[in-house]
Amino acid sequence: MSMADRDGFIWYDGELVPWREATTHVLTHSLHYGLAVFEGVRAYNTDIGTAIFRLKEHTERLFNSGRIYLMNIPYSRERLMEAQREVVRANKLEACYIRPIAFYGSEKMGVSPKGAGVHVAIAAWPWGAYLGVEGMEKGIRVKTSSYARHHINVTMARAKFAGTYANSILANQEATMDGYDEALLLDVDGFVAEGSGENLFIVKNGKLYEPELTSALIGITRDAVITVAREFGLEVTSKRITRDDVYIADEAFFTGTAAEVTPIRELDNRPIGSGGRGPITEKIQKAFFDIVHGRNPKYREWLTPIQ
């Protein structure tokens, strides 16, 4: 089914409009120059009904992305948080992916967006395991990309903005065309950065490591995983990680709103650890799903009911 040809509603510039009518002009500035900021958010079915995971943090990151790129989003944080709840309710969804996006309109053309209006849209739709149900259980195969992740002074890694994803698309296409499930990108110095749309963790000798975040997005799921891991008594360290550090890790996994917690069983045809989902990964994965489905009352504050 085409993303454009669906029933339902999209929140567009302050109003719920029929899905097929949520359109914009072909001369929209952001379509040509790539300057749009967006979020990926998930809602889950919980014991308190449908609830959005870490809505406040995702909305804050959207506004931070706008600030980095001098984009003044014309709504308050509170309005956009309510709009995300509203669009889930309007589409009668129990579990879904939510995509808020702010972009420049068609009021002008040219590299500078000055004079173009900022528009905001929010869509929501059902979306299961991003990297596959089997991958969640058995782990995925990953290829180190020949494309480097952006240097911090090329694009701003603290922003989740559309233009960055051209780099991600190249890496992901290269990996999937070669028969892998996902790509791992290195930074310009040759150290591990992140996946095409995920943060990376490795496990070695009972400790958890993540790459330094110079060239990687500060993931919200990543932050949740670190919190849970430390609650388990695991030491979590951010440091420069090499590709061969991943080769000889005991376990590895990706995190992200779409990817959730996805084990990595292989990198560049080299099995990671036992070549499947490791015990620490499985423990963290279970804890994560307990939290997002409302089964852990300690983290209830991370869930915002849609009603």
Regions found by a protein language model. Give the residues of each.
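Helix-start/capping segments and mature chain N-termini
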Residues: 1-75, 79-86, 109-307
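Short secondary-structure junctions
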Residues: 89-96, 234
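Short, internal active-site loops enriched in acidic
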Residues: 103-108
